[in-house]
């Protein structure tokens, strides 16, 4: 049997499909999610049901979002899952997650995310942070490293700052390529993202926070003074507790937010 065919389904390159088939890893992921009846569970990209099936054994109803028509059809006819699932066939990147929220029952989102869309999909999900209890995702290990990174490390970047702005980030489990069919060329890892009830350092204008992050990380080897000279003077940086001669890659989330909030308060400067 060809190694890109699993349970009779051929993995599609354009959907970035790699199917999980290691029972030990699957068990670890389901334990991390810890699904309970009555929770508002949503799986993104259930694929061939490696995580869907064991979650289905724990709960009576949950929702899945699947882009691949054949896989959605397969789930509709699944002997154990068909009655438990609400299937949304379509693109999670364009999906309005507010339609799934129930009173006093926030979303618990999980999935083995296609690596080609994981970053933009997370940015899309952050928009719904108030409606989400937690998220558990299998991602490229390098992406998990970026989510969990601290200032000054190579992995630290815009994704780090925006993820940690909205969520507590907890790496859960490392996953070797051999856990998949076909095996990807990279290591994977599972991460837990828990949106804050109250944002620890709220930005007055998210577009400005995004802008200071982009400008900083696009020129991460410059000094902060040079990087932001068109936006913030050295005096203002000093006032905000930012050393103008440090590099943007060493700025903390709090410092990025302080800079963005100063720009929000001083639009004409």
Curated annotation (Swiss-Prot):
Name the UniProt record assigns to this protein: Ribosomal RNA small subunit methyltransferase A
Which species does this protein come from? Answer: Vibrio parahaemolyticus serotype O3:K6 (strain RIMD 2210633)
Cell compartments where the protein resides: Cytoplasm
**SUPFAM superfamilies cross-referenced by the UniProt entry:** S-adenosyl-L-methionine-dependent methyltransferases
Reaction catalysed?
adenosine(1518)/adenosine(1519) in 16S rRNA + 4 S-adenosyl-L-methionine = N(6)-dimethyladenosine(1518)/N(6)-dimethyladenosine(1519) in 16S rRNA + 4 S-adenosyl-L-homocysteine + 4 H(+)
What gene, per UniProt, encodes this protein?
Answer: rsmA
InterPro entries per record: KsgA/Erm (IPR001737), rRNA_Ade_diMease-like_C (IPR023165), rRNA_Ade_Mease_Trfase_CS (IPR020596), rRNA_Ade_methylase_Trfase_N (IPR020598), rRNA_adenine_dimethylase (IPR011530), SAM-dependent_MTases_sf (IPR029063)
Write down the superkingdom of origin.
Answer: Bacteria
- Indicate the principal place this protein occupies in or around the cell: cytoplasm
Residues recorded as binding S-adenosyl-L-methionine, renumbered to this chain, are 18, 20, 45, 66, 91, 112
Q: Which GO terms describe its molecular function?
A: 16S rRNA (adenine(1518)-N(6)/adenine(1519)-N(6))-dimethyltransferase activity; RNA binding
């Amino acid at each position: 049997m060809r190694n890109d065919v699993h349970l009779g389904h051929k993995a599609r390159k354009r959907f970035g499909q790699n199917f999980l088939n290691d029972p030990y890893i699957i068990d670890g992921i389901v334990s991390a999610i810890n699904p309970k009846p009555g929770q508002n569970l949503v799986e993104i990209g259930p694929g061939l049901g490696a995580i869907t099936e064991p979650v289905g054994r724990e709960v009576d109803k949950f929702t899945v979002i699947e882009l691949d028509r054949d896989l959605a059809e397969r789930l509709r006819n699944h002997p154990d899952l068909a009655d438990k699932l609400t299937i949304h066939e379509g693109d999670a990147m364009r999906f309005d997650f507010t339609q799934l929220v129930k009173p006093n029952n926030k979303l618990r989102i999980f999935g083995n995310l296609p690596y080609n869309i994981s970053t933009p999909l997370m940015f899309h999900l952050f928009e719904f942070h108030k409606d989400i209890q937690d998220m558990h995702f299998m991602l490229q290990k390098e992406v998990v490293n970026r989510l969990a990174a601290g200032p000054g490390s190579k992995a630290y970047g815009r994704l780090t700052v925006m993820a940690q702005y909205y969520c507590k980030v907890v790496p859960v489990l490392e996953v070797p390529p051999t856990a998949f069919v076909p095996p990807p060329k990279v290591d994977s890892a599972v991460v837990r993202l828990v949106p804050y009830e109250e944002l620890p350092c709220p930005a007055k204008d998210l577009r400005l926070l995004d802008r200071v992050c982009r400008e900083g990380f696009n020129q991460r080897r410059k000094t902060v003074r040079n990087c932001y000279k068109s936006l913030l003077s050295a005096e203002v940086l000093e006032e905000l507790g930012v050393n103008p001669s440090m590099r943007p890659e060493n700025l903390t989330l709090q410092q990025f937010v302080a800079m963005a909030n100063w720009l929000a308060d001083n639009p004409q400067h």
